[in-house]
Amino acid sequence: MNIETNTVPQNLDLAQRVEELAAAAETHDGVAPLSEQFLIGLRDDRLGHRHLLAIEGDEVLGVAALDGQTVELFVGVDNRGRGIGKALVDALPASPQIWAHGNLPAAQALAKRNEMDVVRRLLVMAIEGRDLRAAEEAPTTVDGLEIQTYTESVERFGREHVEAEWVRTNNEAFSWHPEQGGWDLERLHRGMEAEWFDPADVLFLWDSHGGAHSAPTMAGFHWLKWHAEDTPAFGEVYVVGLAEDYRGRGLGGPLLTAGLQRMVEKGADKVILYVEADNDPAVKAYERLGFSIAEEHCVWAKSD
């Protein structure tokens, strides 16, 4: 077995083999080993991901995908227990931060053998059935503000203004966030290239404080994702955020509810979201709505 550095997006056959290996791991483990961005990075070299592959003959045994110091790593189901995970970790650059999606026992054991500790926890929370139907019946109207889809907003205010406001609001809402913060239009457009993107599933909260003849200000947005490939299909609160000047005014609830209504209209009986485990106010707010913790994803790293 060899550990090879490879530019996977430049070899589509190799990218497909890694995707198939990841799909088999997801079926076996019940959780995807690679997140959406790292899956996209297998084919899109604009993301600049590096890949370490454990190779034996023509077979890919395991994969480590790197974005700077952030790593997502997994071993194929049929080749676990052979030390491949350790070999991949040993080949990583110094001070990696390794995601363990689902924080499965094997990942925990590998991390502990390498003297790593959990430095970040990301929760998947879900709401379904009667709890979802009760939550989506809450009010969505806010005095002086209106909710419109991306399509409706572009028709009224123009694409340039809408997307500039979207980027500004996103960066104010997620100035602290390692993946979601610091976006520009190019990064936004990459996100909109996703096969699942639906402009009708992006909701904006607008403040037309200046009247009909001035451009409105975006107070918040709710970007939804419809998981049509799953059976049954379900919805996701992909990103929801408020602009800095609109926090603390009770606007998050109506904006979230509007998204839940949209997902129920599409036939969802379940909606999920991701939230940082240390964001206690948000976790408690989601629990009050009826969400509960369904999965946990962890980042492991060596302590300073």
Swiss-Prot record:
State the InterPro entries in the record. Acyl_CoA_acyltransferase (IPR016181), GNAT_dom (IPR000182), Mycothiol_AcTrfase (IPR017813)
Q: What is its EC number?
A: 2.3.1.189
- State any single GO MF term: mycothiol synthase activity
Q: Report residues binding 1D-myo-inositol 2-(L-cysteinylamino)-2-deoxy-alpha-D-glucopyranoside.
A: 36, 179, 225, 236, 274
Q: Which Pfam families match?
A: Acetyltransf_1
Enzyme kind, highest EC tier: transferase
Positions bound to acetyl-CoA 2: 240-242, 279-284
Q: Which residues form the N-acetyltransferase domain?
A: 145-304
What are the binding positions for acetyl-CoA 1 in this chain? 73-75
Q: Which cysteines are joined by disulfide bonds?
A: none
Give the reaction(s) catalysed: 1D-myo-inositol 2-(L-cysteinylamino)-2-deoxy-alpha-D-glucopyranoside + acetyl-CoA = mycothiol + CoA + H(+)
Q: Which UniProt key words apply to this protein?
A: Acyltransferase, Repeat, Transferase
Gene Ontology biological process terms in this record: mycothiol biosynthetic process
Q: How does it assemble?
A: Monomer.
The record's comment on protein family reads:
Belongs to the acetyltransferase family. MshD subfamily.
What this protein is reported to do is described as: Catalyzes the transfer of acetyl from acetyl-CoA to desacetylmycothiol (Cys-GlcN-Ins) to form mycothiol.
Q: What is this protein called?
A: Mycothiol acetyltransferase
Whichever gene encodes this chain, its name is: mshD
